[in-house]
């Protein structure tokens, strides 16, 4: 299982890189769960990241505005992100979500077919009125994405496991794999919860708070020693 760590700036990116993270995921926590950062921050982090190491960019907890989202996704692609990650926050149905993601996939793949498009849903979708998390694999499949992902929308200390049982998460992973895609799971995941994700076959685990001082995704800063501890668990 590989580790995605979400820095908000270049200083944190260096900590994640030196800690051994597999994917450097550019994020802007004040703007939400999958808050989008600025194009120049993506460019700076891409420049700071070694060749061969993948850079991801969150495009935001997006609303049902396919044109706006597609343009933002293309901006992240041109800025150097390898993974383009869309949080389906304001899409209320399968059809709306597919509409957004299909257009994103078309824009990103037209620019560079090797880029990886991630459809991200929310385990706590019921709290914000987002699309059902358990249909994210079908949405990703039907819109030409490469990865189906789950996170949590509300960052209040509750984790992925507070909203979905391990059995449902296992079904999510298995369905994603059945469609030939990779599965990523995140959502205020604690270090001690990571082995459960490995056990159910998750491909990518995404963290920020667990790698930050005081476990605080907003006020804390990513530390390489904390990243190293998590990398060790992922690779055991």
UniProtKB/Swiss-Prot annotation:
Keyword Chloroplast part of the UniProt annotation: no
Pathway annotation: Cofactor biosynthesis; methanofuran biosynthesis
Class in the EC hierarchy, top level: lyase
Protein origin, superkingdom: Archaea
EC number: 4.2.3.153
Catalytic activity: 2 D-glyceraldehyde 3-phosphate = 4-(hydroxymethyl)-2-furancarboxaldehyde phosphate + phosphate + 2 H2O
Family according to the record: Belongs to the MfnB family.
UniProt protein name: (5-formylfuran-3-yl)methyl phosphate synthase
Species, as recorded: Methanococcus vannielii (strain ATCC 35089 / DSM 1224 / JCM 13029 / OCM 148 / SB)
